[in-house]
């Protein structure tokens, strides 16, 4: 039995069943050692524990598949991906080397419905799916998501650029739909953010009375304390776009490349052990999401139609 995949509580239950002693105060790694030492000799390989580091038992799958996602997605096993990050063509006329970004809107939305349906089939019940897009496009795409799939709307604020528009509001963000089917995984402490100066200088450490009629009758008081690792993550992610000097080192030849910092934050927010599946990227593009998964130590499967971008992805992954 591979005890490394079990929680501490499950290991304690096994110790009880075996009528072992001295397990109640043991750490998970110590419990694994106890159980392995108590197991009868067998040809079945046992988990090896050294110090406090659990050895990986699942080999990494890291590959870029060339082809149309509508052809490749059906070949993937159901409930196999722990994270899906989809950065599809926005249908605004960008040049990806084909006409995929120049469709009539009804055709585009029907196409989106197909890859979303297949992606959700591949997504694990407790997995998380992200879809990038401009707000006005994503609002239409969201209508193609089954009603029983849970969702939230978050934003990526560029912070360092605006998309020029002389006759309307300057665009300074993109939207991200977050989807999950059942219980979501969310690691808030892995993606905490810097506190604002206003909070640190004006509120941290001070006592404040509760707002009457909101949480109490106004008789309760709260002391705001700054967490050592930063503030809770907000649904507006502030990360510079790869524009100008800020993106010079990371920038490659792709029209819609996403920053590694953004991709890594999304993955860290909901990642699970390697044994729980891979990161699926239906539109690999520049390879940022795949590279982020590799940097974090997860398996990934990227799908890309354009042969030149497949080469670009593989070059970034090698370097």
Cite the ranges covered by each PLM segment.
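Basic helix-extension-helix modules of the SAP/HeH family
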Residues: 1-48
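Small/flexible residues
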Residues: 7-10, 20, 30, 194, ...
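Conserved hydrophobic residues forming the short capping helix/wall of the S-adenosyl-L-methionine
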Residues: 15, 145, 317
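The DNA-recognition helices of helix-turn-helix-type DNA-binding domains
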Residues: 18, 38, 286, 296, ...
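Core catalytic lobe of class I
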Residues: 44, 48, 53, 57-303, ...
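PRPP-dependent phosphoribosyltransferase catalytic core
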Residues: 312-319
């Amino acid at each position: 039995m591979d005890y490394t995949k079990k929680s501490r509580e499950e290991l304690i239950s096994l110790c009880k069943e075996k009528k072992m002693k001295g397990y109640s105060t043991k750490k998970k790694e110590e419990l694994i050692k106890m159980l392995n030492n108590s197991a009868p000799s067998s040809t079945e390989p046992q988990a090896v524990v050294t110090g406090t580091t659990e050895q990986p038992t699942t080999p990494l799958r890291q590959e870029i598949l060339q082809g149309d996602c509508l052809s490749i997605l059906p070949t993937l096993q159901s409930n196999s991906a722990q994270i899906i990050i989809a950065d599809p063509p926005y249908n605004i006329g960008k040049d990806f080397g084909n006409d995929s970004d120049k469709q009539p809107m009804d055709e585009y939305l029907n196409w989106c419905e197909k890859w979303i349906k297949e992606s959700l089939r591949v997504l694990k019940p407790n997995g998380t799916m992200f879809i990038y897009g401009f707000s006005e496009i994503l609002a239409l795409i969201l209508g193609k998501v089954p009603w029983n799939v849970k969702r939230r709307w978050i934003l990526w604020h560029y912070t360092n650029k605006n998309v020029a528009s002389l006759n309307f509001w300057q665009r300074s963000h993109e939207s991200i739909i977050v989807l999950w089917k059942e219980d979501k995984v969310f690691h808030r402490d892995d993606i905490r953010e810097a506190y604002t100066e206003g909070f640190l200088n004006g509120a941290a450490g001070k006592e404040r009375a509760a707002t009457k009629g909101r949480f109490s009758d106004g008789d309760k008081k709260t002391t705001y304390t700054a967490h050592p690792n930063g503030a809770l993550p907000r649904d507006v992610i502030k990360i510079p776009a790869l524009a100008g000097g800020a993106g010079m080192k990371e920038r490659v030849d792709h029209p819609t490349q996403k920053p590694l910092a953004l991709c890594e934050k999304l993955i860290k927010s909901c990642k699970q052990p390697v044994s729980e599946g891979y990161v699926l990227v239906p539109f690999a593009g520049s390879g940022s999401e795949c590279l982020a998964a590799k940097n974090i130590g997860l398996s990934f499967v990227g799908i890309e139609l354009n042969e030149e971008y497949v080469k670009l992805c593989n070059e970034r992954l090698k370097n």
